[in-house]
């Protein structure tokens, strides 16, 4: 309270967000428009954030301020749109095509929250993968130096081939996400190429959620 003394402004919001995070209270942000200045910190501090293509933006200063400060003209989308934050900066975790898709992703995030105690895990009805596991020999090349998409492996292992991927477009050489195997909820981390710093950042974030 001494650090953030205001009662109604952003200092108080940041204080509460930080405290909720420390207490393990999940925070999911759905950005459906502009998040500017202090508002830009809210989705960045959330556990998971969702942005909508060509509709959501996150930045501390908008295009007019950028032009005033640097003389550079830049669009809001190029400055802080979904493509920037889902694919390059990693600030956002999920890329939605439209608002209904963003809400659908948010529901999936809530469904995957790790709040249930281990002894209370709910087992879902077992559904076989949509793709035959016998095809794995054709998916994974005999030469391990030959690249392949590990998602094709996951699709042949998890129930109903349903995989809720996390940060799909960021750190793409590491694939992370939630699924079910034999009805049990699982978190999956799979190598998908050369490991880069973005991949490590993504993996650490996912482990904290899982």
Q: Which residue ranges define each predicted feature?
A:
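Generic, ordered loop/turn and secondary-structure boundary motif
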Residues: 5, 14, 59-61, 66-70, ...
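Short hydrophobic/aromatic-rich motifs at helix boundaries and adjacent loops
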Residues: 11-12, 54-55, 125-126, 178-180
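Conserved catalytic cores of soluble enzyme domains
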Residues: 1-118
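Gly-rich Lys/Arg/Thr-decorated short loops/hinges at beta-loop-alpha junctions or inter-strand turns
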Residues: 1, 24, 67, 85-87, ...
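Terminal amphipathic helices with adjacent charged low-complexity linkers/tails
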Residues: 94-154
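Short C-terminal domain-edge/linker segments immediately following a structured domain
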Residues: 81-83, 125-127, 209
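Generic detector of short, locally flexible boundary/turn motifs and exposed helical patches
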Residues: 15-17, 51-52, 58-61, 141-146, ...
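Non-catalytic terminal/interface segments that mediate subunit docking, oligomerization
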Residues: 145-210
